[in-house]
Amino acid sequence: NLNLLGEREPGQYGQRTLADIMQELGQFAEGCGVSLDDHQTNSEGGMVDLIQQAGTEGVDYIIINPAGYTHTSVAIRDALLAVAVPFVEVHLSAVGAREPFRQISYFSDIAMGVISGFHGESYLLALQAILNRIEP
């Protein structure tokens, strides 16, 4: 449902669209001299395919918002483990302050870190955390 950002529950997820967030993130990445590819899919299989593609293309890091699959997807977890690309789990809402079922993540124990609750800024914070770990 990330394609509905800006329309769907703006109190939880913010008012900016995914395109707006990704444009800002891309500009920040470019200013830091790193390349960034962004993808969005509503399907679990599509997300597995994108993760596997990242692994074969030699991607250095993944920033992933598994959204509703956070609490359900062994397939996405297994794909992340299979490619062994370090990743940051991102959530726009403060999942720890939401319903109990949303507080369960199949990914947080294998992630470099988890950032949640900062709406669209969560992606920027994830990228900054990754850049801080890259040695000059």
Question: Which residue ranges define each predicted feature?
Answer:
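Glycine/Thr-rich phosphate-binding loops of Rossmann-like dinucleotide-binding domains
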Residues: 4-5, 72-73, 98
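Glycine/small-residue-rich loop that forms an oxyanion/phosphate-binding "nest" at active or ligand-binding sites
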Residues: 77-93, 105-108
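Short helix-capping segments at alpha-helix termini
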Residues: 30-33, 83-85
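N-terminal small/polar loop signature for handling phosphorylated ligands or for N-terminal nucleophile
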Residues: 41-62, 68-84
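Short, glycine-/small-residue-rich phosphate/pyrophosphate-handling segment
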Residues: 37-38, 88, 97-136
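Short, glycine/charged-enriched secondary-structure capping and boundary segments
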Residues: 8-13, 52-54, 76-80, 102-105
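Glycine-rich phosphate/diphosphate-binding loop of Rossmann-like nucleotide-binding domains
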Residues: 1-31
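Short glycine-rich anion-binding loops that position phosphate/pyrophosphate groups of nucleotides
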Residues: 1-2, 67-70, 93-95
